[in-house]
C-alpha cells in the first residue's frame, strides 16, 4: 500500500496561483513494507499524480507477487505562510487476483508543522467477505539532512505498532533511501521454532526516480 503523504499547496488567507502539474514516479525496494507489515520481499512500483490549486489525484501500482496492487487516491491540501500544512483525502487499495489480499478503503488526514508530521487514517477492509474496521496513527519527524523517524500504531479491529528510522537523499536526480523497521509480533510474519509470532526487524533499501 502506498503511504499517502501530506500534499500542501496554496495558503490560508493568501491568493492561490492557478497552477497544474503532472508528475510520474518509478521505484524499487528491497523489501516492500507498508505501515510495518511486509507485503513482498522486493517490489517494483510506478505512479502518476495530478495536482492543481491544492487538489490532487493519483494512482500507484506495485508488484506483490500474486498479482498487482493498485491504489487510487484524491484529496485537497493547504499550507499556510506560517508553515502549517494539512490535507484531507480518500484512498482505495485494490489487488488483481484473489490470493494476496482484499480491498481496503480509507479516509486520510495529514497535518504537518516544521519537522513534525501526523497521519490519521480510518478505513474498512473487505477481508475476503469478513468486513472489518481499522484505524492507523503515524507520527513522523523529518529533518533537513534527510533523516527521519516514524512511529505507527494500528487500532480498532487491527492491532500492532512499528518504528522506522531512515535516511533519504537524491544523487544525480535519483532518489536513494535506507531504513530500519522494527515491527511488533502482531504485524510480523516471523515465527519461532514453536510457531509463535516473533517481532520483525528489517533493513530496507530503495531507489526511485520522479519525472
Where are these regions (language model features)?
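Outer-membrane beta-barrel proteins
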Residues: 1-211
